[in-house]
Structures are given as structure tokens and as C-alpha cells.
Amino acid sequence: MGTIDTTGILAKHAIKIAEELCSPAIIVSGDFDLAGIETNIPIYYVPRRQKSIIDNLISDSLEDEKRLKSILEPMAREATGNTQHIEQAAAIEHIIGELRTGTIVGLIQTRESGAIVTHEVSQSPLIRTIQECEERVDPEVMRVALAIAFDIAASGREGHKIGTAFILGDTEEVLQRSHQMILNPYAGHKDEHRNLLDKKNWESVKEFALLDGVFVISEEGIVQAAGRYLDVDAKDIDIEQGLGGRHVSAAAITRDTFAIAVTISESGGTVRIYMDGKELLCLDYIERPSLQK
């Protein structure tokens, strides 16, 4: 009896499901080769997650029930982890503007199993967080700030990892509760050269992200200042232990004003969103998926 081509069967069914759903993309995690399958739907490949349930298998000496549990629990964790990996990749591509909303189809393979999953992009925690901030900051400004944050998290600047923060909205209050550490590089420039909605201005933001301090950005996306120091009382701010002063002060300014803060950690490139002094979302850096040509 011949060997069943499980990956090939899964791949063909994933394509069929995606076409029936009019999916904006198929996102693949694992050793699937879809090069020979014709479809007009964009196919993205995300890097494989490192941990596999085979690393969690135990010796035969344990009781069967415990042994089964020790296999099933890691399998459930891995399935959840791989699904979240695909969902996060889809959300980031949507934020960056490479992926429209809709139901994406994910194709997952590990050394032990394979699966097809579907995910509605608009229901992503990241997208819902942006919607939660809509009353305070224009959603497009929020999207652009996150796109720049992901870019900084991924590539840094001139080979160096960068940590910075964007304080969005309630500009007048934020400026009153902060001061310049250096000469404001945006002072005196026309709005058109400070507008984040114009992609031509993103490079200057990434350049000035090397400066100490934070960016202050209006709810309409106009950069008011860079290299700004926040004068806040960090007392009673409850954030993850081990985070530095930039994260503490960014969280504190959102407690004291109606601003939203987006932070990028220098170590690891983790992107966080704060509102009302609390962390709304934490996204660990993941390598962006590659588009199949």
C-alpha cells in the first residue's frame, strides 16, 4: 500500500476552502510546498515555531493515563500556539497594509500533525484594540503608528536595536506634562513634513527613534515633538516587572491624560499598547511572513 500524501491533501483542501471563502490570503506554517498549486489567492509563509510536541514526549515507564495526558496537553498547547502565530502574522500584515480584512486560511504542519484553520482578521485582538482606541485617536493614525513600530521592532536602525515610544492624542495635556531633553527636531517644520499619514515621513521618525525620550503625536497624526521627556508620577503603575523607565512613564501618561501609548522594547522588539495606565496589548516580535512569488 502506497504512502498517503497527507501534506498534499491538506494543501489542496486549504486552497479549496480559501477560494470558497474568498480569503484575502493563505498563511502557511510548516513544510508545505504550494508552488505547484494554482490559485489567485496570495500565499504567505511564516517561520516555523521552534517548540514541537515531540520534545515533550515521556518515557514508557509512566502510567498510560499520565502518558496520554502528557502528550495531549502539549499537543493542545502547540495547536493553540501555532494558530496564534498565524493570527498574529495576519494581524500585522493587515496593519502594515498588505492584507485586507476577511477570513484567512491557515495551513499548519509540525513534525507530528497538520491542520487547516480559519481566522477572521477583523476579530484579531490587535484589530479590536485599535477599535477600542478609536474615540481618542484616528484609527488610521493608530494603524500607521503600529506599522512604524513593527518596522522598528524588526529592523532597528543601522543594524542597532531601538527602543522608543509614541504618545498619541491629547497633545496639549501631554506637552504640558513633559519637556524636551534636546532641541525638538520637528520644531518649525510644516505639517506636511510631520504628518505620519504620508509614508515619505516615516524615515525621519525611524531616524529620530534613536534619540532618548518619546514622540508626541496628535490624534490626526502630526508629530509635535521627538526626544521628549515625560514628567509623570509612576506611583501605582502596574506593569510587567523588568520593563524600563520608558514603559513606566508611557503607561503613566496614559493614566493622567487621554493619550494612547505605543512602546517598542529595545530588547526583543516587543510592541505594547497602553491606555488609562494599563497594558491593552503585548505583541512579541515575529519575523514577517514571506509572500510566495
Q: Where are the regions that the model predicts?
A:
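Divalent-cation
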Residues: G2-A252, A261-K293
